[in-house]
């Protein structure tokens, strides 16, 4: 089973991607994780990528395409790709690669939330720069305001978590995804899931669909 999953900032797609990965034994491929790993290396590329994120702008297509497709060369089937493709150029690069290698996508799933919900979820997030613990001012506040429960360090807000940056990222997401959604609708594999509510509530909207696809693909392979 091969899945594309996408959604606006704060939609919970990465959280659900990891649950899906574990439940169905898939390989998790995240463009965001690969970009952040490059930034953490402190490489010249990482420094350039950090500038784009700080301004709420998309990473250049050629960079993201190279990162994702190089990963796909190692894991050609049973994968979930989180947050890619996000532009028409990325769709073209991915589709060309899949066609050349006889790979098909079973479902392109969008977890959708409103702009207001997106801004609230992301802008309230606080990170511990020392141990990496994540908090939220509303949903998971620290015991002592501004301090990490685990190590006592001062919590910070990432630059790209500021409300004005989140709003910009949301608008950019909606604009860029419109033609991509149309493309996957034409292929008959696009599904939109309501991302409002708790993690468990959203998961119960996702699980029946993926169970069905998983069982369908299992039977298809048995009959080959």
Curated annotation (Swiss-Prot):
Reactions listed under catalytic activity: AMP + ATP = 2 ADP
Cellular location(s): Cytoplasm
SUPFAM superfamilies according to UniProt: P-loop containing nucleoside triphosphate hydrolases
Presence of the UniProt keyword Glycosyltransferase in the record: no
InterPro entries: Adenyl_kin_sub (IPR006259), Adenylat/UMP-CMP_kin (IPR000850), Adenylat_kinase_CS (IPR033690), Adenylate_kinase_lid-dom (IPR007862), P-loop_NTPase (IPR027417)
UniProt key word Amino-acid biosynthesis: no
GO cellular component, as recorded: cytoplasm
Top-level lineage group: Archaea
GO molecular function: adenylate kinase activity; ATP binding; zinc ion binding
GO terms under biological process: AMP salvage
Entry remark concerning the domains of this protein: Consists of three domains, a large central CORE domain and two small peripheral domains, NMPbind and LID, which undergo movements during catalysis. The LID domain closes over the site of phosphoryl transfer upon ATP binding. Assembling and dissambling the active center during each catalytic cycle provides an effective means to prevent ATP hydrolysis. Some bacteria have evolved a zinc-coordinating structure that stabilizes the LID domain.
NCBIfam families linked to this entry: adk, PRK00279.2-5
Family membership: Belongs to the adenylate kinase family.
Assembly notes: Monomer.
PANTHER family to which the protein is assigned, alphabetical: NUCLEOTIDE KINASE
Role according to the record: Catalyzes the reversible transfer of the terminal phosphate group between ATP and AMP. Plays an important role in cellular energy homeostasis and in adenine nucleotide metabolism.
Protein name: Adenylate kinase
Native organism: Thermococcus onnurineus (strain NA1)
Gene name of this polypeptide: adk
């Amino acid at each position: 089973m091969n899945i594309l999953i996408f959604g606006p900032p704060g939609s919970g797609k990465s959280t659900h991607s990891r649950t899906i990965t574990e439940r169905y034994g898939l390989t998790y491929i995240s463009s965001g994780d690969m970009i952040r790993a490059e930034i953490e290396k402190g490489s010249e590329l990482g420094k350039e990528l950090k500038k784009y994120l700080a301004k709420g702008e998309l990473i250049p297509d050629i960079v993201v395409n190279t990162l994702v497709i190089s990963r796909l060369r190692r894991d050609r089937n049973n994968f979930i790709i989180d947050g890619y493709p996000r532009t028409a150029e990325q769709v073209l690069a991915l589709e060309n690669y899949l066609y050349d290698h006889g790979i098909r996508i079973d479902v392109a799933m969008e977890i959708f939330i409103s702009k207001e919900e997106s801004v609230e979820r992301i802008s309230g997030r606080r990170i511990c720069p020392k141990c990496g613990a994540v908090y939220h001012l509303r949903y998971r506040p620290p015991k002592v305001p501004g301090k990490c429960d685990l190590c006592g360090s001062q919590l910070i807000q990432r630059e790209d978590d500021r409300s004005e940056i989140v709003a910009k990222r949301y608008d950019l997401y909606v604009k860029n995804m419109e033609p991509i959604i149309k493309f996957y609708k034409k292929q008959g594999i696009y599904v939109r899931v309501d991302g409002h509510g708790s993690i468990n509530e959203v998961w119960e909207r996702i699980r029946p669909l993926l169970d069905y696809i998983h069982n369908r693909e299992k039977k298809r392979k048995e009959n080959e």
